[in-house]
C-alpha cells in the first residue's frame, strides 16, 4: 500500500466488551475479519507479545492502508480479503489454531464520510456502494445497464 491515507475517524464500538469476550492471551492468534481502520485490532494487538499474532482482513484497500499505518510495529498480518475467504488466508500463512475471531459487520464512519463511495445520504457523489472498489461494478453502472425487473430482483 503506497500513499499515506488520512487518519481514521471511525470509533470502534464496545471496545471493552470485545476485548473481554475474546479472552486474549499474549501468545494467541486472533482474527479481525473486518479490520477496517484498526480500532479493535489495535486493542487486540496491544495485548499480544511477539509470539502472538493478529490477522486482519478487509475488502477495503483504503481501510487496510489506514490500519497498516496505525498498527505499524505490532504483531499483525493484514490481507486484502473478504472474511468468507478466511480458510484460504489461514492456509496460505500456515498458522496454528485460532484463539478468537472478531467480525464487526456494517459500515464504518470512514466509508460513510467518503463521498466517492456513495454510502451516505448526507452527501452527493457517485453511487458506488462497493466495499472493495477494485472488484465488481459500481451501483451507478448497474443501474444504467440492468432492466428495471433485474434491479427489482437485486433490491
List where the protein language model places each region.
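S-adenosyl-L-methionine-dependent methyltransferase catalytic core, i.e., the SAM/SAH-binding region
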Residues: 1-155
Amino acid at each position: 500500500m503506497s500513499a499515506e491515507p488520512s487518519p481514521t475517524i471511525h470509533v470502534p464500538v464496545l471496545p471493552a466488551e470485545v476485548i473481554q469476550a475474546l479472552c486474549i492471551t499474549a501468545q494467541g492468534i486472533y482474527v479481525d475479519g473486518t479490520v477496517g481502520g484498526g480500532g479493535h485490532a489495535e486493542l487486540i494487538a496491544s495485548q499480544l507479545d511477539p509470539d502472538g499474532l493478529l490477522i486482519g482482513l478487509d475488502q477495503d484497500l483504503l481501510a487496510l492502508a489506514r490500519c497498516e499505518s496505525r498498527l505499524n510495529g505490532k504483531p499483525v498480518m493484514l490481507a486484502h480479503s473478504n472474511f468468507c475467504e478466511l480458510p484460504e488466508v489461514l492456509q496460505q500463512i500456515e498458522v496454528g489454531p485460532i484463539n478468537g475471531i472478531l467480525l464487526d459487520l456494517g459500515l464504518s464512519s470512514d466509508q460513510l464520510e467518503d463521498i466517492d463511495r456513495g454510502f451516505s445520504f448526507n452527501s452527493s457523489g457517485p453511487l458506488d456502494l462497493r466495499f472493495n472498489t477494485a472488484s465488481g461494478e459500481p451501483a451507478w453502472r448497474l443501474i444504467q445497464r440492468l432492466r428495471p425487473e433485474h434491479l427489482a430482483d437485486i433490491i
